[in-house]
């Protein structure tokens, strides 16, 4: 790791740093990652045209930063994913082998006990990388009685460590392998302020802050879906999906003339759900994005 910092007269600022980091969680050849970052800042309040005319402005700093951050936290249960694991057959409570391999048919059929893979090796797994950009302003006025900070941030996270879902059944895998198959972008702004005032012998400070952030799943290894709205791609992380309620069933005639609700027997007074795809039935293929996520944007 290394860092270079330069400050000229508290007016211009330059900072560069980097890290070259290794992790035991990845296979040789993928263990190391290089993560650089830099930042630039300009304190406009130190310029003569401001100092001579706006004496009540103590600081007005404009700054920008760009950098990459690596993440090797794949969970204790997923350590060393580049190693495969196998298990012997073992026996159940009846004394019979758990895993039996059958060969041949009819009178020529044979059964053999053996071992099986419990985890496939994922040799290509490497660092999850977040590319971050931040544009901000730091403000201080009236001898630091009022201070404020505002930031706009943007992050694109690639190589997110997830379980593979788009795998054909003919692979015969008992457990799905892991891979760097996720990609998410997020952006928003963050602001805070502080107002300080002395009233006699009492020092008072009023503080406030606000944060707004939104994200979107750009890539995720998912099974094929009949309808595009069933994918998580294109929606927010942890987006809640469900059926759309259209009202209540008035009577049995209403039930008979409405799309069939496949999740159970309905009666008058039960909720009537919308047939989103128009196929005449209401089931999991009619679940769409509804409501907010588990983490609010604001």
Regions found by a protein language model. Name each.
Residues 1, 166-179, 227, 231-233, ...:
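Surface-exposed, low-complexity loop segments enriched in small/polar and acidic residues
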Residues 1-26, 31-48, 130-132, 141-148, ...:
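Surface-exposed extracellular loop regions of Gram-negative outer-membrane beta-barrel proteins
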Residues 13-22, 44, 109-118, 164-176, ...:
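Flexible, solvent-exposed coil segments and beta strand-coil junctions
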Residues 22, 70-72, 156, 212-216:
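Feature marks short, surface-exposed loop/turn motifs that line or immediately flank catalytic pockets
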Residues 43, 65-69, 209-215:
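Short glycine-rich beta-strand segments
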Residues 50-129, 145-147, 151-184:
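Solvent-exposed loop/turn elements at secondary-structure boundaries
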Residues 77-96, 198-294:
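Conserved small-residue
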Residues 134-136:
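Glycine-centered tight-turn and secondary-structure capping sites
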